[in-house]
A protein has these predicted regions:
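Extracellular glycan-associated modules
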Residues: 1-169
């Protein structure tokens, strides 16, 4: 899926490298992050986001994994790591947002971690699976759709302009 995204065009980081090893791309979310225009995700009633990450460290504010969120209008969705290794999922339905965190399983530093976020529109829940364990489930009204903002979709960067650190958030 990363092949569908473009690397950030910031000329301040023209000398950056994107090393690859074992079919994985290594990037820091500061000089390298990815973006794309919205497309199929905005139309989907149900979808799964899947991430395979091996964080070497997490900032004290937490780090964005996936972001297409506007916190001012409570629109969109974001998946973030908190400073203590929990996975945070934010769903914005327009006018209100719901947040939930991994409970049963969290992310380990310097190890591969597999994260699934499964959004089920018809059933009215969102599952968070971390390393094969159903870590938490958020229930909301059945047939409730995420209201998507006009933001691009980002990997490794927070889309919300008012976040604490503009690179990763």
């Amino acid at each position: 899926m990363l092949s569908q995204f473009k690397m950030n065009p910031d000329p301040a980081y023209q000398n950056r490298l994107l090393p690859e090893r074992d079919n994985a791309s290594f990037f820091d979310g500061y000089s390298v992050w990815f973006y794309k225009e919205q497309g199929d995700l905005q139309q989907a009633n149900a979808f799964t986001l899947e991430f395979e990450i091996a964080p070497f460290g997490i900032s004290s504010e937490g780090d964005a994994i996936f972001s297409c969120m506007d916190r001012k209008t409570s629109e969109g969705m974001a998946v973030r790591l908190t400073s203590d290794g929990k996975v945070e999922v934010i769903l914005g339905f327009g006018g209100r947002q719901m947040v939930f965190y991994s409970i049963r399983e969290n992310v380990d530093l310097e190890k591969w971690n597999h994260i699934f976020v499964i959004y089920r529109f018809r059933e009215g829940w969102c599952d968070l699976v971390v390393n094969g364990v159903l870590s938490n489930r958020l229930q909301f009204g059945r047939f409730q759709k995420i209201k998507w903002p006009r933001h691009k979709i980002f990997i490794g960067k927070d889309a919300d302009k008012d976040c604490l650190t503009p690179q990763m958030g």
